[in-house]
A protein has these predicted regions:
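Surface-exposed interaction regions that form or flank ligand-binding interfaces
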Residues: 1-94, 101-106, 112, 117-120, ...
Length: 233
């Protein structure tokens, strides 16, 4: 009788151990899915001084990186910069998440890698993120209006470039895991879109542009702006 219970105990223990091992293995595979599905982009890591493994634990950096991968798919000659620190009049800095130098001009991106529902309008100081809490509950989180943030970026970038200022475009980019439920804009000066919409939006903007930057001009602007990625607050 004892032998029967012992064999049964060993069998149950073995099954539990096997299931636990598989669950752990599946979890590790899931954790590695994000990083393994991304092709490396040396410019991002070099400019931001971010290690590839850090992306898995930082949603903000994930959003910037994913945006960079999309921008790299744009046709034609271009340059991309990340985390530019531009000095303001009072000596403090304002940070641009990502910037694209394109034949049609300069695109300034404020990246928000959020989930849930997003509500906001151009003139509100704060926007709202609504997250599901399960069982019919929801939680609200306020965050500073990203359009106002980008207005500051545009102002001081224009000041920094001085006379050498092509068209400047303001883009607020939300991640693909959210829903832009109610976004009210007063004009078309700012675009509020998701990552999957970026290529189409820039292609349309480029078609309407009266500016054409040559590869030499793009390189000049890149050399002018690259040092700003080295500055820290």
């Amino acid at each position: 009788m004892f032998g029967f219970f012992f064999v049964a105990f060993v069998a149950v223990f073995g099954i539990v151990f096997f299931i636990s091992y598989k669950l752990l293995e599946d979890r590790e595979d899931t954790d590695s899915d994000w990083s393994s599905s991304q092709s490396p982009e040396p410019d991002y890591f070099q400019q931001t001084q971010t290690a590839p493994w850090e992306l898995k634990y930082n949603k903000g950096k994930q959003g910037e990186y994913q945006l960079g991968q999309v921008l790299n798919q744009l046709y034609g000659y271009k340059k991309i910069l990340y985390n530019l620190y531009i000095f303001k009049e009072d000596g403090t800095t304002t940070e641009i998440d990502a910037l694209l130098i394109h034949p049609s001009g300069i695109y300034i991106f404020e990246s928000k890698n959020y989930k849930g529902w997003i509500f906001g309008s151009e003139n509100q100081q704060y926007w709202t993120q609504v997250l599901s809490g399960g069982r019919g509950k929801s939680y609200k989180h306020s965050f500073f209006n990203p359009i106002i943030q980008n207005k500051v970026h545009l102002r001081w970038l224009s000041y920094y470039l001085n006379q050498y200022t092509p068209n400047l475009y303001s883009y607020i980019i939300f991640g693909n895991d959210c829903q832009l439920k109610e976004i009210h804009l007063n004009s078309d000066r700012h675009k509020v879109i998701q990552t999957w919409q970026v290529i189409g939006a820039i292609d349309r903007q480029a078609c309407q542009s009266q500016v054409y930057l040559s590869p030499e001009q793009i390189d000049d602007l890149y050399r002018m702006l690259l040092p700003l990625t080295k500055r820290k607050q």
